[in-house]
Amino acid sequence: MNRLVEEIIKPILEANPQIKKVVGVYGGRFQPFGPHHYKTYKWLAKQVDDAYITTSNIKKPPRHPMNFKEKVRHMSKMGVPSNRIIEEKSPYKAVNLAKKYDSDTTAFVYV
């Protein structure tokens, strides 16, 4: 068993028996999304019930050259299902994503 499961997820589930689902969130700017990001997403998807990438719609070149739609297109070409890419005002706070789940029975793990 890996450290994420052993040190984070397992204790959450043991301390909170009402938790039925663990959602992994990989947030970032992803300007651009590269193979190392994809590898991290695939790893996360194997550890949790549902895995998502959260990113913003900020486009301010040169540091932020891609908007959300462009990022989704790029990530999808690399193999991330488009329904697993969520737009957030801040990619490190999955507010929109959290609305899709029951807060009493879902735990969120951010990587």
For the regions a language model picked out, list residue spans one by one.
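Nucleotidyltransferase catalytic core that binds NTPs
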Residues: R3-V111
